[in-house]
Amino acid sequence: MKQLLNTAINAALESGKAILEIYHSGVFDVEIKGDNSPLTKADNVSHNVIISFLTKTDIPVLSEEGKSIAYDERKDWKQLWIVDPIDGTKEFIKRNGEFTVNIALIENQKPQIGVIFVPVTGELYFSTKEIGAFKVKVDLKNYDPETLISKGNKLPLFREDNTFTIVASRSHISPETESFVQEMRDNYGAVNLITKGSSLKLCIVAEGQADCYPRFAPTMEWDTAAGQAICECAGFQVIDWNTKESMLYNRKELLNNWFLVKK
């Protein structure tokens, strides 16, 4: 498992380097996909870099920017990588820095390894069931995955402010989310609300900066798999709103149900 974690970290960091080159160039070549979401040159470049690492593991890969794989082909996969080469493409285009690279290893529908890299800040989040969840700052000019793993700060981190804190989407605050926030205000009195793009919301809960993350709007498996792995290893739950159980992966329908991340 440690070697697979090293591979996923290398893939995320090298794709982060490639993304930053395009980010700083300002030439994004934006297209609109069939689902009306944006696609940039950086999404495709990141996908290709990640695939070049993960194919060496002989574990199949399901990527947002890869070819569509029929359920009949993948339903018997015991292991697979689930990848979002750039989570938060809208944030990338807006140049606000709130986009991530997400890589997860799934075994028997459950997240086992999670790696999330934030290229603009150099923050790397990673987890396995054996070692737990960690955060470390990366210098992309000079790094070694083994050293990074040993230097990581174990999650959750200490938080001074005990005010009940909710993190929610910057781009997708639904009426149901607003109702949930109001319900928490009724329960707890003062409530802090943080808004962020991409899988940073899951990272913020795993860090202990927020108490919960309600997501009552559409997401796909590649948006959440890595973040769920990290949250679970930090002691949080990612609960499917319909089943009231932990979210499972490599389902026939890759669109997630609503979910709630909490202790």
What are these regions (language model features)?
Residues 73-75, 93-97, 127, 252:
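Short glycine/proline-enriched turns and hinge-like loops at secondary-structure junctions
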Residues 1-12, 16-17, 148, 178-187, ...:
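Oxyanion/phosphate-interacting regions
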Residues 44, 66, 171-172, 218:
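Short, surface-exposed acidic/glycine-rich loop or hinge patches that mediate macromolecular interfaces
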Residues 58-59, 164, 191, 236:
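A structural micro-motif
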Residues 104-202, 246-247, 251-263:
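Acidic beta-strand-loop-alpha-helix segment within the catalytic core
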Residues 79-116:
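Glycine-rich active-site/cofactor-binding loop and its immediate structural neighborhood
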Residues 19, 43, 54, 89, ...:
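Residue-level signal for inorganic ion chemistry
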Residues 1-86, 179-182, 196, 203, ...:
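N-terminal subdomain of lithium-sensitive/metallo-dependent phosphomonoesterases centered on the IMPase/IPPase/PAP
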